């Protein structure tokens, strides 16, 4: 493929700023998702039964940790190892492919969470839908194991296919001025094909997520109309559960669309135009989205909120004890 590539130089200040933002995003994302993981995993250690939603959140936090780690490695590769004038190296392409697989697993887990909310909150009247909701509630652990197994198989197959495929590059250089050259790079097409394949396989879970979220929205509308007719109590547990579930699902939808658009835009920026600054902006957006949704999940989950309150109270008491200890030592002096 013949592409006209303009080489954009990136200053040291821009690379340092991007790396600092990447470290900050990685730290925030790692802490929020590790917190969700540890709170739920601690119940497993204590042999306390996990609810279906907690199991999904546990798997979701693990996939997000992988996402943040891969995006941080991508940022390091982009700033220090990937040169603009050269084709994409193997390690950078492998990191991007693994991110696509982790992102697809993240979408499947969100679809499972949406189905679980539907089975728990919607009051079905049709016999088939009642049986389907009961089946989803009973088979959620098997669904999670299937998602993990499929993600592992896809990872092994994609990595094996990528590294077993012959890689070659034909580059024709035609200097038109000081910073423009004409490159024919066949090697970079591997990343484009892998990106397209992963996005096509993301269509079924995305449609499943949209359908289940739409059903939950319709159920909320019906419930609100019923409340207006039969009751005047504004604090209804079912209504609050509907609203919390929709907040987490709508926030995931917004963050996923933003992250997917950034990933989609980054491909031509990287392969065709070699615009490293544009790719840096896209990677920064992609890293911020999982952290934002993790914060929404923490704010909407009672167990996670209690854990946050406990940690804050412990930190406050520790600071107070230290302050009292310093005051006592000064008094003795």
Curated annotation (Swiss-Prot):
Topological domains annotated Extracellular:
1-17, 77-94, 164-190, 273-276
Which residues are listed as membrane-spanning?
Answer: 18-38, 56-76, 95-115, 143-163, 191-211, 252-272, 277-297
Single GO MF descriptor: bitter taste receptor activity
Q: Which domain of life is it from?
A: Eukaryota
SUPFAM superfamilies attached to this UniProt entry: Family A G protein-coupled receptor-like (SSF81321)
Q: Which InterPro entries match?
A: TAS2R, TAS2R38
**Signal peptide start-end:** none
Q: Which GO terms describe its cellular component?
A: plasma membrane
Q: What else is known?
A: Most taste cells may be activated by a limited number of bitter compounds; individual taste cells can discriminate among bitter stimuli.
Q: What is this protein called?
A: Taste receptor type 2 member 38
Q: Which organism is it from?
A: Pan paniscus (Pygmy chimpanzee)
Q: State the gene name recorded for this protein.
A: TAS2R38
